[in-house]
Amino acid sequence: MSFQAMETFAEISQEILMSATKPPDFDFVLEQVGNYGTYQIVFFFIICLPTSLPSAFSAFNIPFVVGNPPHTCHIPEGKEYLRPLTNDTQILSCKQYNETQINVFRAFTSAPVDTYSDRISLVPCQNGWDYDNSTYLDSLVTEFNLVCDQQAWIEISTTSFYVGSFIGNCLFGYVADKFGRRRSFFVILTVLIVCGTASSFAKDIESFIILRFFTGLAFPALFQIPFIICMEFMGNSGRIFSGLMTSLFFGAAMALLGVVAMFIRRWRQLTFFCNAPFAFYIIYYFFLPESPRWSVSVGKWADAKKQLKKIAKMNGKSNVDVDELVDSMKNHQNAAEEKETKRSHNVTDLFKTPNLRRKTLIVTYIWVMNAIIYNGLTLNVSNLPVDDYWSFIINGAVELPGYFVVWPLLQCAGRRWTLAATMIVCGIGCVSAMFMPDGYPWLVASASFIGKFGVGSGFAVIYIFAGELYPTVVRAIGMGMSSMVAGSGLLLAPHIVNLGKIVKILPLLIMGLMALSAGILTFFLPETLGAPLPMTIEDAENFGKKPEPDSGMFTQAAKKRESQPLLEPHTPMDRRRRSSRLMNI
């Protein structure tokens, strides 16, 4: 036997040894049945994508529902003298002259009120308010008179939604990982439809706030769970596609909501329209499958086989022996993996090991910054010299081009560099507003839109990136926890925007610095392009521990793609290839 033959024999022997110890993981099995074929595309467009509509419509109709139009004290006919003689809209909105004092003066003089108005005290509106209905035909504010000393109810109604989101993120993240994605989705959908629709019939502000809380409880998970299912059905390129298309559709849904609200200018009808029609999605119960990746992670092998066979059949790969592949994966589960899949998981698992803890904290910080900036810029857009409806439409539409920009970047530059770039662009755009010359408000608006362009793109990337960093056994918990903390951060957004009353440019400056800090911190996360999704806590802890010697943007991404083996050492085809090579020796 020649030296070359001996070398080849040694190489093959090593491959055979590897095949005995290295089982096929789920990503390999999914690749065999098709990880981005007809099944995934049909599933995504018919089932996953449409579920972005109810989450966008239910959550973001609130600016129109609580629209606060210009208003003044209602002055009875013939008593115009009760209206304060000032151009201060804040006074005119909530104050009128004290009628008792005026009557005393009028008993002794016939002089006009303006001659002694400085001696008349101002009192709260005594006869209700007159509202300008040129923008809103009615709203929660105008129906329940939530103005002046009652204005705090508007903030409470908004806050109740975010408090519900905060709790729902944690609760339904656990439920989705414990009981499955499919069951959780329909529980959440039912809660949102019932409570959202019921809020359109609220008889008082207290009832509306309670129902709004439960709507918020369901909102985050309703958006996240279909995305998680899609991501767990697909390979690397499919995950990019599904993540960006979901965000693209969400942005389009936001713009569409602005158009719908423009035609439905009564808050009860709008609230009903934004919730009740989505009861149609209940029929998805008969079509939405459980994630086979989740089934594998909790040891439901029969369910995983059944779903993988459907995928293989629809993708034209019926010749693949799914039973053999899944049985091999099952039989080669090591003791640690078996322990992982059988025990119950909770949010503390994300913090027990140092590497996963570090990644969790960084991802959560970036998510919080993204959420505050995204919502802050949305609120700040209302200050542009266009009406509320056009502001909202522009706010949704400006995100759309960003998704087309990050799509190729995610595949050639990777997740880390793309996320960092989007947040830094956002930061530069917002901070640049302070350098704009006075008298050119459109320049400040452009800076704000550049910021929204960046943070909107980053919103799509963080979902993909976080989903690939968290392991399957706690993926929904991890994403729910990060989103939950971000939801609590959302309470800061209105206060940051209100700082514009002190210095107009201050909100953009603060949000710009937030974005820059998030962009820089992104570089401390490992790249996930081309890497298999971690299944267990151990997988996630080991991933990214050792930085690659060459961390260049395009070089690293290319190496990850090239490093993917064409044939795994445990496949039947590879065994035949080895036999052929041995015969040639």
Curated annotation (Swiss-Prot):
One of its GO terms (molecular function) is organic cation transmembrane transporter activity. Residues 575-585 have a biased composition (Basic residues). Keywords: Glycoprotein, Ion transport, Membrane, Transmembrane, Transmembrane helix, Transport. Residues 62-155, 206-212, 265-269, 382-389, 438-446, 498-504 are extracellular. Residues 544-585 are annotated as: Disordered. Disulfide bonds: none annotated. Glycans are attached at N87, N98, N133. The chain crosses the membrane at residues 41-61, 156-176, 185-205, 213-233, 244-264, 270-290, 361-381, 390-410, 417-437, 447-467, 477-497, 505-525. It is found in: Membrane. Signal peptide: none annotated. PANTHER family: SOLUTE CARRIER FAMILY 22 MEMBER. This is Organic cation transporter 1.
